[in-house]
Amino acid sequence: MGKIIGIDLGTTNSCVAVMDGDKPRVIENAEGERTTPSIIAYTQDNEVLVGQPAKRQAVTNPKNTLFAIKRLIGRRFEDQEVQRDVNIMPFQIIKADNGDAWVDVKGDKLAPPQISAEVLKKMKKTAEDFLGETVTEAVITVPAYFNDAQRQATKDAGRIAGLEVKRIINEPTAAALAYGLDKGKGNQTIAVYDLGGGTFDLSIIEIDEVGGEKTFEVLATNGDTHLGGEDFDNRVINYLVDEFKKEQGVDLRNDPLAMQRLKEAGEKAKIELSSAQQTDVNLPYITADATGPKHLNIKLTRAKLEALVEDLVARSMEPVKVALSDAGLSVSQIDDVILVGGQTRMPLVQQKVAEFFGKEPRKDVNPDEAVAVGAAVQGGVLAGNVTDVLLLDVTPLSLGIETMGGVMTTLIEKNTTIPTKKSQVFSTAEDNQSAVTIHVLQGERKQASANKSLGQFNLEGINPAPRGMPQIEVTFDIDADGIIHVSAKDKGTGKEQQITIKASSGLSDEEIQQMVRDAEANAEADRKFEELVQARNQADALVHSTRKQLTEAGDKLSADDKAPIEKAVNELEAAAKGEDKAEIEAKIQALIQVSEKLMQAAQQQAQADAGAQQAQGNNGGDDVVDAEFEEVKDNK
């Protein structure tokens, strides 16, 4: 059985790890980095760049460089959070035919799972290069507060990338696994505060050790799937834009190129202010008007940054209070606080967390790598390599169905340990009703329309009877990935209807299969492109060496001998500029064949040179050589 890798598919950065013996190991990518920017770029010549190469060209290609795609995954275009992003993202977010938020790149409509699959493919390749074997299975992490649609979409991304997703686990739970695996004996309750690039989670987790086996039980989780480092960056960018407008009278918001430079500079300034008290944001030639070029030079202090984002930090504390309340615990009952996610490096975040919990958070967990490490541990558990760990996660949101009057009737309460199963009997609302629609909802509101609709299905063929008489048993079954299966059964007739909830929109199996085929076709295209480049490089080297030999041969070759060689060189040079690998290889062989006389001339020249050197050496006098040998012997 192959290795099951652990992937932290992050909003801003992604990371991959694997169990190396009995220890989890974070794997470095081709650029030598332990994390990879979750950035995907589509270039003019239809090349797909992922990670650092995509980030490097973002300034010159803002409309086709996609980032923070995780904020769109499993979401409807009309969602309030998506509408906020529509106005600030340099790329074009569009409404798909199924109502989901997709992205338009150069006229192609791309689904978020399809885009995220490019990052997962990079993670898969990183692991394969390290392990020296093909990887087909993975554990992928998601924010604890992701709903069913977002979890399904993440699994779809894995399938498109050629991975069988063995388990979806929650990011804070994965971080707890990474933290608790090598800690000493004894039971403890920890809070995992996970503020990443685009999402925020808070989980209360109890770590128990019984008979050498560690149990990680999630007591409660809460969060905000649209709060993270990207929002902090946007505050900085907006401040810089407003300051520049005050000084220069130019609004940079209409200039995608300038905004991309600002995004880069804003993120850099934010990071610098975690260790410095102030920084200069200096962007020469940011734009130009009739009076000439304009330069942006603005001082940003840590105090100003904190003033810009303090409400975001305060917003993160609300889910903390809810999770503690749901777990039935007070702050004093929390033994340790773990910080996860790059944004937790900000001193203000650390200060507010310490103030709330009345203790300093732990510093011995790497906020960028802990989640991937935990996913790798879970991969080891599923592969049977790690046997002393048991993970008990929860469903983050309540689940139920819509009942008469537009009310949501809850079957499974939030923070119920998964996997779980729950049944409840309902009846008809009207006399002689022959069918019922089961409308599945996820959320905490009593009003059905205020919750997330996960889908609906019909149970037909109910025997005519007065209202309230038929007995319809609705069963919810949540698997270990947190994905929901619902069935409805008429107890009178025994008729049953069941579905695995797909998002009310989401990707159909056909669409996913098509995207898998596209991804495989791209892999084939990438391989062919690599072979073409190798052939071109071989051609360039041969052209260069042949021309050099022609020059060195001088008059040792007649013009008649040189002409076919020069013709073959020119033909190979022209072929190397084209896209036909077979033609390049044919021209390489043709040049090698016509160059035989040139090779002979070059060999003769080399032999003549060697003979001349030998003769020169012999004329140098034997005495000197003898003396040298004698000297060496004396030294010994």
From Swiss-Prot:
Keywords: ATP-binding, Chaperone, Nucleotide-binding, Phosphoprotein, Stress response. One of its GO terms (molecular function) is unfolded protein binding. Pfam families: HSP70 (PF00012). The keyword Phosphoprotein applies. The keyword Nuclease does not apply. The modification Phosphothreonine is found at T199. Induction: By stress conditions e.g. heat shock. Residues 600-617 have a biased composition (Low complexity). Residues 599-636 are annotated as: Disordered. Belongs to the heat shock protein 70 family. Acts as a chaperone. PANTHER family: HEAT SHOCK PROTEIN 70KDA. This is Chaperone protein DnaK.
